[in-house]
Amino acid sequence: MDWVYAIVYGIVEGITEFLPISSTGHLILTGNLMGVPWSKEVKDAFEVVIQGGAILSVLVYYWRDFLKIRHLGHDRSQQTLWTGVLVATIPAVVLGLAFGDQIQAVLFKPSVVAWALIVGGVLMWLIESRRVQPQVHAIETIGVRRSLLIGVLQCLALVWPGFSRSASSILGGMALGLDRPTATKFSFYLGVPTLGGAALLNLVKERELIFGEIGLLNVVLGAGVSFVVAYLAIGWLLKFVSTNNFKGFAVYRVAVGVLILVLIATGVMSNGSLA
């Protein structure tokens, strides 16, 4: 059955990693509803692997854009863009290295994730209800100040598991004047160093568990499925935000958060620490 769990986890991760709906919340639901028999350590390690597959999909989807880094020395727009990405990554790196373990130990509970989904959904609805014209329409013109603020806001997902890194960076960008497509694309870019770095670090630390207990076949299967599904999700989301707002996602987040709370209240799901 492990290969079935690998495929399902890969699908869930691929769909939810870049949509503003919290991959954490959905992986919790998936594991509980399917009764996945893996230990907490195995689940954590496997989620890191399949997250790597999702991150790789961004590099492949935007491979032409990433190749422009070659012109960094003389292309001012590329200098501005990648300086912004670097600056926006710093807050999460500092916070994660300093307090990552403590945050997981104290806050990583299903009820905390559920409320993060609900509150994030409400904020998403409120931001989408503003009558404000966006000022930034290209990621090359975001600038260092806005990038840093988006990076700080992205940390909300780190200190409040379930809020969603994608949601915090996209909503933060929109609140700072980016239009939806630009905020969404910048969130994709920002995920590469933020999530990619975390995935590599955990892969090195947990390599024996990942390849020993999970098995190479399941690792390749889960990461491969995550890559393909995430690639499709990126294309779909970019097309969606060009003509639609995020209010539907806001309602969905609240519904999933309420569902988790109901499952906890009825004893179907334990509210014990996930760390």
From Swiss-Prot:
Claim: Flavoprotein is one of the keywords in the record: no
One Pfam match: BacA
Signal peptide: none
Subcellular location: Cell membrane
Transmembrane segments: 1-21, 42-62, 80-100, 107-127, 147-167, 184-204, 214-234, 249-269
Annotated membrane topology: Multi-pass membrane protein
Keywords: Antibiotic resistance, Cell membrane, Cell shape, Cell wall biogenesis/degradation, Hydrolase, Membrane, Peptidoglycan synthesis, Transmembrane, Transmembrane helix
An individual GO BP term: peptidoglycan biosynthetic process
A Gene Ontology term for the protein's cellular component: plasma membrane
GO molecular function: undecaprenyl-diphosphatase activity
Reactions catalysed according to its record: di-trans,octa-cis-undecaprenyl diphosphate + H2O = di-trans,octa-cis-undecaprenyl phosphate + phosphate + H(+)
Main location: membrane
Main EC class the enzyme belongs to: hydrolase
InterPro entries (alphabetical): UppP (IPR003824)
Enzyme Commission number: 3.6.1.27
Purpose: Catalyzes the dephosphorylation of undecaprenyl diphosphate (UPP). Confers resistance to bacitracin.
Entries under PANTHER family matching the protein: UNDECAPRENYL-DIPHOSPHATASE
Misc note: Bacitracin is thought to be involved in the inhibition of peptidoglycan synthesis by sequestering undecaprenyl diphosphate, thereby reducing the pool of lipid carrier available.
Similarity-based family: Belongs to the UppP family.
Protein's name in the database: Undecaprenyl-diphosphatase
Gene: uppP
